[in-house]
């Protein structure tokens, strides 16, 4: 369903930040590598947080020993969710049209299967690509990077301040988390009432779920659940979602909220299974 170049987004996000993954996806869309549908699917499914941010999340809850489990579980679940979410509206209804307006045909879709020669071909292709890339591309890319950065930074600062204020000084997130308690209890998660708000606050800022439970006397399984869930939700408006809205992918606020809710509802039982197996 997705081109192999989607690995570029995942790697960019893992080593840098979700916004970098979105930027790379937007750029590949501009270069007519992705169709609009492919770009939207890649951005909303593979713009994961960086490995460094994973470390920050486990540090906040003083559970550094979980780092390996959290990273591997999140990576696996991200791919499971991607296979499901891209087949559900609104992503399934996006047009297979390139940036230049050309409709993608069946003949244009490259069907490739993994084989023992795949890695060798990938290394050869990457080496060829690097050798053909002029150094001037780094200079010509600077204006685009700066423009994209300016677009999202001001919005991020404003939204992060508002989100933190609402989380710390109002019961708003506690209220919206209440309907999730029965769902978490159905998944047999310990401390369901305590972690329920953390399942939804991540739409504002990815660190909020972990900050919500930090210092609470809850089971390690529940801590693992909250950390992994927050990282696989992908959509949070202080960075990734904001970057998507500022890109040319034309993803609207209501669409991103809907994708967040879909990802969350599907991810909860999957993450719960991982939590029960590992703990």
Report residues per predicted region:
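C-terminal transmembrane helix pair
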Residues: 35-85, 207-279
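Short helix-coil transition sites and intra-membrane helix breaks within transmembrane domains
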Residues: 10-20, 169-171, 197-208, 231-237
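Transmembrane helix-loop junctions in multipass membrane proteins, especially transporters and channels
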Residues: 29, 63, 86-98, 168-172, ...
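Intrinsically disordered, low-complexity non-transmembrane regions of multi-pass membrane transporters
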Residues: 91-146
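Hydrophobic alpha-helical transmembrane segments of multi-pass membrane proteins
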Residues: 8-15, 72, 146-149, 153, ...
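Short, amphipathic, aromatic/basic-enriched membrane-interface segments that mark the entry/exit
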Residues: 38-44, 126-127, 195-196
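Transmembrane helical segments that form the transport core of multi-pass membrane transport proteins
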Residues: 128-218
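Hydrophobic transmembrane alpha-helices that form the pore/transport pathway of multi-pass ion
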Residues: 1-47, 214-221
């Amino acid at each position: 369903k997705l081109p192999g170049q989607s690995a570029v987004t995942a790697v960019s996000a893992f080593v840098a930040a979700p916004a970098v993954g979105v930027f790379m996806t937007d750029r590949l869309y501009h270069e007519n590598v992705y169709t609009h549908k492919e770009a939207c699917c890649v951005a909303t499914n593979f713009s994961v947080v960086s490995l460094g941010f994973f470390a920050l999340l486990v540090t906040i809850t003083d559970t550094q020993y979980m780092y390996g489990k959290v990273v591997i579980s999140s990576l696996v679940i991200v791919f499971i969710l991607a296979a499901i979410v891209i087949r559900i509206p609104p992503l399934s209804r996006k047009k297979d049209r390139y940036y230049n307006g050309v409709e993608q045909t069946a003949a244009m879709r490259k069907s490739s299967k993994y084989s023992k020669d795949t890695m060798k071909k990938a290394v050869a292709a990457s080496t060829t690509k690097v050798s053909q890339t002029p150094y001037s591309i780094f200079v010509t890319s600077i204006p685009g990077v700066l423009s994209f950065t300016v677009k999202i930074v001001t919005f991020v600062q404003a939204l992060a301040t508002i989100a933190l204020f609402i989380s710390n000084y109002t019961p708003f997130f506690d209220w919206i988390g209440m309907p999730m308690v029965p769902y978490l209890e159905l998944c047999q998660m310990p401390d369901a009432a305590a972690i329920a708000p953390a399942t939804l606050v991540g739409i504002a800022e990815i660190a909020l779920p972990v900050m919500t439970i930090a210092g609470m006397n809850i089971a390690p399984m529940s801590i693992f659940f909250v950390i992994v869930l927050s990282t696989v939700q992908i959509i949070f408006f202080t960075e990734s979602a904001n970057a998507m809205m500022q890109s040319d992918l034309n993803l609207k606020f209501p669409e991103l909220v809907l994708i967040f809710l879909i990802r969350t509802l599907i991810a909860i039982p999957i993450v719960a299974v991982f939590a029960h197996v590992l703990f």
